[in-house]
Regions:
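Short, small/polar-rich loop/turn modules that mediate ligand/substrate recognition or access, typified
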Residues: 177-182, 236-239
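Canonical Rossmann dinucleotide-binding motif of NAD(H)/NADP(H)-dependent dehydrogenases/reductases
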Residues: 2-33, 172
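Conserved mid-core segment of classical short-chain dehydrogenase/reductases
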Residues: 87-105, 124, 128-136, 154-157, ...
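Alpha-helical segment proximal to the catalytic Tyr-Lys
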Residues: 124, 173-175
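Catalytic Tyr-X3-Lys loop
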Residues: 78, 86, 97-119, 140-141, ...
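Residue(s) in the substrate-gating loop at a strand-loop-helix junction
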Residues: 145
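C-terminal substrate-recognition "lid" of short-chain dehydrogenase/reductases
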Residues: 219-243, 248
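Active-site helix of classical SDR
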Residues: 119, 161, 169
Length: 252
C-alpha cells in the first residue's frame, strides 16, 4: 500500500518503538492515531506529528473501539501497529515463593489479549474499506520478542505472551485473506527503549556487545523502517520477522 493519505493506529505510540513508528509513518504522509496510557507524552507526540491521541488500555474493549472509531473518523484506516506491552520479570519459583498468578495473567492480558483486541476491531473496520487496486483493504503488525523463542530466566510470563502473538500470526492472516487484510509480526531483539535505558550503563553495554552484528542495541528507527516496508510490500503476510542482529538469548 501507499502510506501517504492513509490512517494508521499505533498502540504504545507515546514512547519507544511505537513513537518511532508513529513519527516515520507521519513523515511518509500518513495520519497517525496514537493509543497509549501515557496521556501527556502521547498528546505531545500526536501534536508534533499532526496526528491524534486516544488514551487506551488495549485490553479494554471500549477503549480499543474508541481508538478505531477515532481513526475511521479521520479517513481510511489502513494500518495498525501493536507496540503496547509490558515486560515484568519473575521466576516460576523465587525467593518469595511461586510466581504471582496475578502478574502472569496481567502480562498475558496486556500483551496477548490486548494485541488481539486491537487486531479484531481494526480488522472489522478495515474490512469495510473500498479495496486498493491490489485488492488490499489494510495491514496489521504486532510486536512480539525474541523471548518468544529463547526466553531467559524470569521471563515465563513475558515469553508466553509473546509466544501467543507469534502463534496467532498465521491463522489471523488466513482468516483475513478473504477480506484483503494482511497480518504480520515483528520479533525484536535487544532494543534501546525506555524500558532498557532504565538499566545500568554497564548492563546496556554488555547486552549490545552480545549482538553478533551489528554489535549495538536496536533503535526505534530500525523497527519503524521494517514496519514501513511491511506496509509497502503486499507479499509480506502471515509471517514473523526476527529483527535481532542474529542474537540468540542466553539463559540469563
Amino acid at each position: 500500500m501507499e502510506i501517504k493519505g492513509k490512517v494508521f493506529i499505533v498502540t504504545g505510540g507515546a514512547s519507544g518503538l511505537g513513537e518511532g513508528t508513529a513519527r516515520m509513518l507521519a513523515l511518509r504522509g500518513g495520519t497517525v492515531v496514537i493509543a497509549d496510557m501515557q496521556v501527556e507524552k502521547g498528546e505531545a507526540v500526536a501534536k508534533e506529528i499532526g496526528g491524534a491521541f486516544v488514551r487506551c488500555d488495549v485490553s479494554n474493549e471500549a477503549d480499543a473501539q474508541a481508538v478505531v472509531d477515532k481513526a475511521v473518523s479521520l479517513g481510511k484506516l489502513m494500518g495498525l501497529v501493536n507496540c503496547a506491552g509490558i515486560a515484568p520479570a519473575e521466576k516460576t519459583v523465587g525467593k518469595n515463593g511461586a510466581h504471582s498468578l496475578a502478574l502472569f495473567s496481567k502480562t498475558i492480558t496486556v500483551n496477548l489479549v490486548g494485541s488481539f483486541n486491537m487486531i479484531r476491531l481494526a480488522a472489522e473496520a478495515m474490512a469495510k474499506n473500498t479495496p486498493e487496486v491490489t485488492g488490499e483493504r489494510g495491514a496489521m503488525i504486532s510486536t512480539a520478542s525474541v523471548a518468544a523463542y529463547d526466553g531467559q530466566i524470569g521471563q515465563a510470563a513475558y515469553s508466553a505472551s509473546n509466544g501467543g502473538i507469534v502463534g496467532m500470526t498465521l491463522p489471523i492472516a488466513r482468516d483475513l485473506a478473504r477480506n484483503g487484510i494482511r497480518n504480520m509480526t515483528i520479533a525484536p531483539g535487544i532494543f534501546g527503549t525506555p524500558m532498557l535505558f532504565g538499566m545500568p550503563q554497564e548492563v546496556q553495554d554488555a547486552l549490545a556487545a552480545g549482538v553478533p552484528f551489528p554489535s549495538r542495541l536496536g533503535t526505534p528507527e530500525d523497527y519503524a523502517k521494517l514496519a514501513v516496508h511491511i506496509f509497502e510490500n503486499d507479499m509480506l503476510n502471515g509471517e514473523v520477522i526476527r529483527l535481532d542482529g542474529a542474537i540468540r538469548l542466553a539463559p540469563r
